[in-house]
Structures are given as C-alpha cells and as structure tokens.
Amino acid sequence: MRHTRFHPIKLAWITAVVAGLMVGVATPADAEPGQWDPTLPALVSAGAPGDPLAVANASLQATAQATQTTLDLGRQFLGGLGINLGGPAASAPSAATTGASRIPRANARQAVEYVIRRAGSQMGVPYSWGGGSLQGPSKGVDSGANTVGFDCSGLVRYAFAGVGVLIPRFSGDQYNAGRHVPPAEAKRGDLIFYGPGGGQHVTLYLGNGQMLEASGSAGKVTVSPVRKAGMTPFVTRIIEY
C-alpha cells in the first residue's frame, strides 16, 4: 500500500477530551532515542482454541466485532457534526474495508484533532505490552498481563477508531495503512514509526517536534520530543486534510 492515497478515508468509527496538546506543523526534531516499545508477538491469542479452524473462526468473529465497534464510534463522531450516515439498518462494512461510509474532506481536520484528543485523554495511563482495545485500556499479555493500559500500537488504534477509522493492531501493519509522507512534510496526526518496516514502535505526531506515545521506557502514555534515531524513511498519513 505504499504511496497509495486514501482520499477520502473510509470509515468504520469516539469519545474524550483533553486540552493542551500543541497545535502546529513542524519537521520532526532530533532527540536522543528512547527504548523501543515492542508490539504483540505473532502468537495465537491466549483465549483462542487450539484447533486451526476454530482459531480462524475466532479471528473472523473478532474482526467483525472490531469493525462494528469502529463503525458505531464513527457514526457518533459524524453525528456530532450533524452528518447523518443512515439509521440502524445501514449495512456494516465488510472486514476487508475500514467502513461503508467516508469522512467528508471538509471535516478531515476536525477528525484529526478528535483523534489527537482521544489519544490525549489517556495521558498517564500505564504502558501495558499488548494492552489497549478500541474502547479503552485493557490488560495486555506476557509482561503486561496484569496491567490495564496501552502499548504503542494499541493506543493509536484506539485513537483512530474514535472517528470510524479501523487500522491494524500491529505497528508493522499500521505503517502501510495509509499514505507514506517524507518526515519533513509531517502534519499533525501523522504516525511516526521506528524499526525495520515500522515494526518496533509507533507514535502520533503533534507538530512542533512533539509526539504522543505509549512509552515502554516512561511506563505510561506521554508526550515526548520526536526521536529521529531508528525512524522509518516515511511517516504514515491515515487521514488526508
């Protein structure tokens, strides 16, 4: 999907308010690298049955549920803007898409700001490896099994779900979920990635050389200076504005 233009963004759909996250567009600044945050290992979920067919069915069911949850959140967001996407009878999007409806281009900037507010509402929430659902913090796996919180990819997935945009769970997949943009052209709301193929960490760009992240080294959701060391060649733009 590299360099594919998502214009306008398909939906499938938010809450939360936080002030004080800086507005502006700036080139990511140099800073010392922090500890990379790992994403979930490619292992079968602890709750999934061992039979391959049962595992596949459980995965499909989880995907359908995530799609419907995101669609409902997106309807709430656009409804708040006075945009009616249809009643309960409107068909749900297929698992192969992020939604049956689209964010109007005129509302894209509002959507980006809502994504940032939704992520910012989780400031101070603990870091939990594998943690985070579309609806909020959750227990993770392994080292995060007893901690309710977010890991890096779980936080950004939660943030975008609020406006009806369903992105993949793993940061390496999130890297290819939108249009790739040179870091010098980064805009507020773009995703910044670290490690080969974006597989080691993801953050949400705020502008002015700052980013919002679920940080393993800080142990919580926090705002940090953008680190250039280990950054991927491109940032990813999920919502065009």
UniProtKB/Swiss-Prot annotation:
Enzyme class: hydrolase
One term of GO molecular function: N-acetylmuramoyl-L-alanine amidase activity
PROSITE patterns cross-referenced by the UniProt entry: NLPC_P60 (PS51935)
Record: active site: 152, 201, 213
GO biological process, one term: cell wall organization or biogenesis
Enzyme Commission numbers on file: 3.4.-.-
InterPro entries: NLP_P60_dom (IPR000064), Papain-like_cys_pep_sf (IPR038765), PG_Endopeptidase_C40 (IPR051794), RipB (IPR049729)
Effect of pH on activity: Optimum pH is 6.
Keywords: Cell wall biogenesis/degradation, Hydrolase, Protease, Signal, Thiol protease
Subunit structure comment from the entry: Monomer.
Family of this protein: Belongs to the peptidase C40 family.
Role of this protein: Peptidoglycan endopeptidase that cleaves the bond between D-glutamate and meso-diaminopimelate. Binds high-molecular weight peptidoglycan, but does not degrade it. Required for normal separation of daughter cells after cell division and cell wall integrity. Required for host cell invasion.
NCBIfam families reported for this sequence: NlpC_p60_RipB
Protein name listed in UniProt: Peptidoglycan endopeptidase RipB
Species assigned in the record: Mycobacterium tuberculosis (strain ATCC 25618 / H37Rv)
